[in-house]
């Protein structure tokens, strides 16, 4: 795994969420990856982008580092829009062939038609929530882990065949 796509999924809100922590985390990842011989390309969801050019980055990448703040228990809406555009537009070419099922072969399962089987991904998130709220049956997330709370994003990558690396999060951000 030498080619890494770093996606900056920050959505700015003036005086509330400027994006400095996201930039700092991306800078740290960039330093580590560069020092270890990785080749890096970047995507910034807030920037104007070409879907075709972004899909070429997805095709090129061996690994995807997806850095974003968690807003209202999920992806910022601009980031969700980016994900929807990339994964849907990549059908039949980059992200998935079909949903995996076959009328001719009942052993083929839903979610097995991904074209990203040679790729790995990592979610790196920032949370206002303290870490003590995860894996705590009395906590806000009612016993769920970080990965369980982010199941929709994980399943999106899984549907496309990508393998999950360990997630990372910074908590108590405000």
Task: Kindly label every feature range from the protein language model.
Residues 9, 45-47, 70:
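Active-site loop/turn elements of alpha/beta-hydrolase fold enzymes
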Residues 36-49, 171:
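A short beta-strand-loop structural module common to alpha/beta enzyme folds
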Residues 32-39, 113, 119, 156-165:
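A structural motif corresponding to the C-terminal end of an alpha-helix
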Residues 50-153:
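Helix-loop-strand module that forms the ligand-binding subsite of alpha/beta enzymes
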Residues 5-7, 41-43, 65, 122-124, ...:
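Hydrophobic/aromatic beta-strand patches that form the interior of the parallel beta-sheet core
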Residues 10-14, 128-136, 172-174:
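A short, flexible beta-alpha/helix-coil linker loop
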């Amino acid at each position: 795994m030498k080619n890494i796509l770093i996606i900056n999924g920050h959505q700015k809100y003036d005086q509330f969420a400027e994006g400095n922590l996201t930039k700092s985390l991306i800078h740290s990842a960039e330093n580590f990856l560069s020092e270890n011989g990785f080749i890096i390309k970047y995507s910034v969801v807030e920037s104007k982008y070409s879907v075709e050019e972004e899909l070429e980055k997805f095709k090129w990448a061996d690994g995807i580092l997806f850095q974003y703040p968690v807003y209202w228990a999920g992806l910022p809406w601009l980031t969700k829009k980016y994900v929807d555009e990339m994964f849907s537009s990549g059908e039949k070419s980059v992200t998935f062939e079909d949903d995996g099922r076959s009328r001719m072969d009942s052993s083929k399962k839903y979610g097995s038609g991904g074209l990203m089987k040679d790729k790995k991904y990592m979610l790196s998130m920032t949370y206002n929530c303290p870490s003590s709220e995860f894996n705590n049956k009395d906590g806000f997330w009612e016993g769920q882990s970080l990965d369980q709370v982010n199941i929709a994003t994980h399943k999106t990558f899984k549907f496309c065949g990508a393998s999950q690396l360990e997630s990372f999060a910074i908590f108590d951000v405000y």
